């Protein structure tokens, strides 16, 4: 028996929507990264983009456990010597683009390279409850029901 290898033309990509309200950031990010890569499918092939298109809504209502909201820092470099800026998760979540916390969490769980960039293109994160992808008829996935640790009352 030969090892099965999926061809890009054979892959059927689904659209899924996940409501992040009250979900723990890290646990949500691991499940989303698995979906984006296609590792939840029996036809998973490492060199083919066989993952789903994932839509995350209510990203600004995702929660951290412990004191990570105040203590976790995100760094960025401006390009000038000595200009490394840092912001806490709380500052980002209360700022203009709260969806960046989830985007960064998922991005850091995806391999870096050409295929990883394509897979990250299949992720759409929105801070509020609305998204413009109703025409794709996305399937709703309830992450909270998978494990009681996936949610946190905050």
Swiss-Prot record:
Pfam families: Ribosomal_L13
Keywords assigned: Ribonucleoprotein, Ribosomal protein
CDD domains per the UniProt record, alphabetical: Ribosomal_L13
A single GO cellular-component term on record: cytosolic large ribosomal subunit
SUPFAM superfamilies linked: Ribosomal protein L13
Keyword Amino-acid biosynthesis attached: no
Ranges that cross the membrane: none
Subunit (UniProt): Part of the 50S ribosomal subunit.
The protein's role, per its UniProt record: This protein is one of the early assembly proteins of the 50S ribosomal subunit, although it is not seen to bind rRNA by itself. It is important during the early stages of 50S assembly.
Alphabetical list of NCBIfam families matching this protein: rplM_bact (TIGR01066)
Protein name: Large ribosomal subunit protein uL13
